[in-house]
A protein has these predicted regions:
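Functionally critical loop-and-helix segments that line ligand-binding/catalytic clefts
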Residues: 1-14, 19-21, 141-215, 258
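Residues that flank catalytic or metal-binding motifs in active/ligand-binding sites
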Residues: 4, 91, 142-144, 167, ...
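Glycine-enriched alpha-helix->loop->beta-strand junction motifs that scaffold or abut catalytic
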Residues: 27-30, 56-58, 89, 139-147, ...
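SH3-family beta-barrel domains
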Residues: 208-232, 246-249, 258, 285-289
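SH3/SH3-like beta-barrel superfamily modules
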Residues: 245-286
């Protein structure tokens, strides 16, 4: 079984030349891209991966393997991570903690987390190896999310194996041998255990930079926030099976026009693929007499 929503995490080990992004993006709901391995090693393909996924309206989070050997080094790694990724406006920032690079990993990772926050990262989470969780004793309660791996038999599908070190986590990486259309190699697959997709992968990144905050089409670009638990973004201004995605409560999206159709008023969301999304913002009778 491959639980939905489907989240993958990738790095330079997944060569862009070997990926059919059109096929792969049709199968996934979000991606977490590696940016660096410590400060001194930059992932060869992180920019390409991010651009290709965002071009196809897949929300992108980022991660960095943590290798800081001192408090100062941890803060420098955070600085480098932020400078390398902030231009892409990732939905979430993850620390990947899989080795003991300094004695006080708890204190060091807290310095890293706080530096990212101070720089402007909205949400910062931590990935920590299951067998190192207790040893490192990270201050996970200060992070915005906890991501743990446990593979079981590692068959490429989820077969019930769960992290054993704690029950308090949000995302579970359940295999390193996943298979999806668009890439013939192995993929890390993840499932969301707590919260929902939109907490980790907001959708407002879908607005292209050239349109952001400019007056285009009918109205000046506006940001609206959903107040219901499931608000449907549709591919046309009418009620039916034309759903692009169901937005969670508190999701922000940008609109640049309003249209009338099917008895409703629709906010129009421009999208990077040149198409439009439509969100119901009220009944027509409430807007006109």
């Amino acid at each position: 079984m491959i639980p939905k929503p489907i989240i993958i995490d990738i790095s330079e080990w997944q060569d862009p030349q070997q990926i059919n992004y059109d096929q792969l993006t049709a199968k996934i709901d979000g991606v977490i891209v590696r940016v660096q391995y410590g400060s001194n090693y930059i992932d060869k393909h992180y920019k390409t991966h991010i651009k290709e996924f965002q071009k196809r309206n897949v929300p992108v989070a980022v991660y960095a393997w943590v290798r800081g050997s001192s408090y100062a080094d941890m803060k420098q790694e955070a600085q480098d991570f932020y400078q390398r990724a902030q231009q892409f406006d990732p939905t979430f920032w993850w620390l990947d903690v899989e080795e003991q690079s300094m004695k006080d990993m708890r204190g060091g990772c807290e310095k890293y987390r706080k530096k990212l926050k101070d720089l402007g990262a909205e949400k910062v989470g931590v990935y920590v190896a299951n067998h190192l969780y207790a040893q490192f004793n990270l201050a996970t309660e200060k992070f915005d999310g906890v991501w743990l791996p446990t593979y079981g038999k590692n068959t490429g599908q989820y077969q019930g194996a769960r992290p054993t070190t704690t029950n308090s986590y949000d995302i579970h990486q359940y295999t390193s041998k996943g298979k999806l259309s668009g890439y013939n190699g192995d993929l890390d697959l993840n499932q969301i255990v707590r919260r929902d997709l939109f907490y980790f992968f907001r959708q407002d990144h879908q607005i292209s930079d050239k349109e952001n905050n400019k007056e285009v089409e009918g109205i000046e670009m506006k940001t609206i926030t959903t107040t219901a638990t499931k608000v449907k973004l549709r591919s046309s201004p009418k009620v039916g099976n034309n759903i692009i995605v169901a937005l969670g409560k508190g999701t922000s999206i940008k609109i640049n026009d309003i249209v009338f159709g099917d008895g409703f008023v629709w906010g129009v969301q421009p999208r990077n693929d040149g198409k439009k999304g439509y969100i119901d913002i009220g009944k027509s009778v409430d807007w006109v007499k």
